[in-house]
Amino acid sequence: AGRLLSEDEQFDCYAAVAEAFKGRPLNIRLADMGGDKAAQFLSIPREDNPVLGYRGARLLLGQPDLVLCQARAIARTSTITPVQVIYPMIADAQQFYTLRGMFRQAIEGMDHGEIRHGVMFEVPSACVCAREMLKVADFGSIGSNDLIQYLFAVDRDNDLVAGDYTPDKAAFWRVLGMIAEASKETGKPVSLCGEMGGQTEYIPKLLEIGVNSVSVSPRIISLARLTAKSRLSAIGS
């Protein structure tokens, strides 16, 4: 749109989707701008390395009006169906505390339904502290695209190092295992999203380590369910 959508415009977009969910939880990520998702209308100064700069949680903390507007639209949406709010690019628990506090303050006095608050695991520092993060969050979501990029210090858009941008590395699965273990210990669910979620060959291993929810594109939902069912049957036998 070339501009920030108003509260009413955001609500109209969310409500159209919420109506289709019929009481099932709707995941909505807070504005994840900056880096590879630059928004010109925010007038952010040019950065030499935007992927490591003013983006995600840092941008939201510096642009509170973004949180205010979106939070109010989300609160209105939650009267239609439960909403799970995902906080992007969280580096430590303090960022999550602060942003969640800003969200709650923004909707104070509003009528709203069930709203749950979750951490996006895509910055390695958050993954290392997964247990502490999940103790205070309602759920977690693993952002595989950025996590791979930051974990291996590889630019996913650079053809020269494209070979290093892969989930097929032991260190990556060790980190996923840490998050899954923290999920079990705290009783907080963890899901996975990103390009990896669309590659069904990873579903069995994800189920094995304890990640039992994966975001996939509509065209492969049936295949993903079949793969998961097959793996769960094998585990149960």
What is the role of each PLM region?
Residues 1-237:
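Conserved alpha/beta-domain cores
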